[in-house]
Structure formats: structure tokens, C-alpha cells
Amino acid sequence: MRTLNVALGDRSYPIHIGAGLLARPELIVPLLRTPRVAIVTNTVVGPLYLERLTAGLESHGIAVSTVVLPDGEAHKDWTTLNRIFDMLLESRCERSTTLLALGGGVVGDMGGFAAATYQRGMPFMQIPTTLLSQVDSSVGGKTAINHPLGKNMIGAFYQPRLVLADIEVLNTLPDRELSAGLAEVIKYGLIRDPAFYAWLEENIERLRARDPEALAYAIERSCRNKAEVVAADETEQGERALLNLGHTFGHAIETGMGYGEWLHGEAVAAGTMMAAELSRALGWLTDDDVNRIEALFVRAGLPVRAPALGIERYLELMAHDKKVESGRLRLVLLASIGKALMFGDATAGEIGAAISRRCG
């Protein structure tokens, strides 16, 4: 097992990475305020892992309440969130009860948001079961639900007390979901870790083959990058915004196509290619750089072209982005492979041209 620490003073917490961690309730139990938990999972993950987690906790004298949500981004909304609140209230969970989010990014985001708001805040822990959630969404305290006008528009920063990343659960992850997670792994190399990017170019096939050593290394390296950024900028006032490379374009794809049609990682990959096109047009990336980025996404099984929603529709959707400031769209772009920057002076024409080069 490998352990990292997210350094946030008295709200610091560990990230445990390894095989078989779901069968180790002793990693969870000492961090509970009271011997009671509420587990949030979904219809895909629950049948695979809920009984194992519940049995382990109950063997340590922990009382367990559960709710099983419908699966998918299309259900990341108020209606589904209220099912969590219903379970918490009907089970008479208290502010000291710990909520465990067992699932991918949707479960983690909604479970975390429920924990942040139930009785004004209850402790929670992340038990991510997809590659994307293990390397990105479970770390850093971003919680949210979607709105018809934009992704993750209603939420809160609320840190977990523990992240438990069991790499064995990735063996049941569909290939498409694994590739989607690789988009966020590649992102860390692009924005701040060129040596890791070079490693990925050498080892991407090992990751797709689910080589346990390669996966453990990539997850640890990704989480280390994320933890360093979050410790320096928890609420995204500066450097943390760079973690959103490809996300402004990508969220437009997800919203425009309808939540769940494109996986988040797929949209991030296509969105990153749009950001790379704009970075090339501004004179920062070379043709070789863009070709390297495209080649790695393709080898990872990810799309490098986006749906043809129309330039005006893209710009309309991007206007709702959380990085818009004083009406100005600020984009995360690449100065080079391994170095990202925030740029707010791109014209609508320049942005539209970058989009058009990657549409259809």
C-alpha cells in the first residue's frame, strides 16, 4: 500500500493506494467519529462491492445504512441527491455519522455534496471505484451536481477525511471507462509533469492492459500532483484552475450532447485537443507538440475530435463556465508539454477557429 497526504492543516487527510483495500476496514474505522456510517453507491458498483464493504465494517461493530442510486451522469441532479437525504433522514443519521461514497465520480460528487450540506456538514470518505475518480475527482474536495445549463454548477468545496483507492476494483471497470480515466492521468503530465508525460508515452499500453504495477504508479503520481496543487490552492483561486485543462471545452461537449452521452474523460480529451489547437495558434505549441498529444490520446483509446454542435453553441455553453470572470472567458492553455497557463485574451474568433479544427 502507498499512502500520500493532502496537507490542509487540521483538515489534512490520507490517500491510500493499493490492492485489496476494500477488505481492510481497519483503514476506515479509526477515523470514524461514531460507530455508524451511511454508504452511498449505485446500481453498477453496489452489486459488486457493497456487501464486501458492509460486512467488513459490521465485523468491527459499525452500524451501516445504505442507498443505491441509479448509475450515470444523467442522474447527477437534485432528484437523485434527495434520495441521499431521504436515506440519511429516514435512518436518523446524525451530524457525527460518516458518509462513505462508494463509486465513481458521480457518486463521489453527489455523496460529498450531500455530506457538505446535511445538518450543515457531516464527515465523509471517498472510496473511488473508477480510474478517473481515483486519480482526480475523489481528491481535493470538489463536490457538485449538474444543472441543465451547465455541469457542476451547484456544489461546494468539502474535503473528505480519507481517500481509499483499491486498484483491484479496476479489474471490473469497462475498457471505455478505463480509457476515460486515462484522460485525467495524461492531463497531469501536460500541465505540470513533463517527466510523467514521457513515462506515459512509454507505458500507456501497460495501463490499458491493467498492469497492476503501472496502474499503482500512475495513480500515485497523479494523486501526488493533485495533492500538491490542492494544498497550495484549495479553493481554486490560482494554480488549481490549471487542473481544468480541456474542461471548459469538455463541459460544453457534455452539456451540449446531453449528460452521459460522452464520458467526462472522453470530453476532456477532445477538449484538450481544442486547447492544444488554440495554444498552437497563439504560437506556444509546435506542430510536433500537438501531434504528440494527439498520438497519446489515440493510444489511450480516447477521441481527439468533438461533436459538431456548431461554433455558436459551443461559445454559448462555454459562457457558463466557472472560470468566466467579469464576463471574460479564461481558458487553461499549454505553453509547452508540461506547463499550463491561464489565458483570458483569446478572441471569439480564435476560440471558434480552434473548435472548428477539432469538430466533426
UniProtKB/Swiss-Prot annotation:
Entry annotated with the keyword Membrane: no
Catalytic activity: 7-phospho-2-dehydro-3-deoxy-D-arabino-heptonate = 3-dehydroquinate + phosphate
Pathway participation: Metabolic intermediate biosynthesis; chorismate biosynthesis; chorismate from D-erythrose 4-phosphate and phosphoenolpyruvate: step 2/7
Alphabetical GO biological process terms: amino acid biosynthetic process; aromatic amino acid family biosynthetic process; chorismate biosynthetic process
UniProt cofactor note: Binds 1 divalent metal cation per subunit. Can use either Co(2+) or Zn(2+).
Protein residues bound to Zn(2+): 184, 247, 264
Domain of life, per lineage: Bacteria
Cofactor(s) recorded in Swiss-Prot or TrEMBL: Co(2+); Zn(2+); NAD(+)
Any one cellular-component term (Gene Ontology): cytoplasm
Broadest EC class assigned to this enzyme: lyase
Subcellular location: Cytoplasm
Keywords: Amino-acid biosynthesis, Aromatic amino acid biosynthesis, Cobalt, Cytoplasm, Lyase, Metal-binding, NAD, Nucleotide-binding, Zinc
Pfam families reported in the protein's UniProt record: DHQ_synthase, DHQS_C
This enzyme's EC code(s): 4.2.3.4
Predominant subcellular localization, coarse grouping: cytoplasm
Record GO terms (molecular function): 3-dehydroquinate synthase activity; metal ion binding; nucleotide binding
Residue positions binding NAD(+): 71-76, 105-109, 129-130, 142, 151
NCBIfam families linked to this entry: aroB
Record-linked PANTHER family: 3-DEHYDROQUINATE SYNTHASE (PTHR43622), 3-DEHYDROQUINATE SYNTHASE, CHLOROPLASTIC (PTHR43622:SF7)
Function as written in the Swiss-Prot or TrEMBL entry: Catalyzes the conversion of 3-deoxy-D-arabino-heptulosonate 7-phosphate (DAHP) to dehydroquinate (DHQ).
Membership in a protein family: Belongs to the sugar phosphate cyclases superfamily. Dehydroquinate synthase family.
Name of protein: 3-dehydroquinate synthase
Organism, as annotated: Azoarcus sp. (strain BH72)
Taxonomy of the source species: Bacteria, Pseudomonadati, Pseudomonadota, Betaproteobacteria, Rhodocyclales
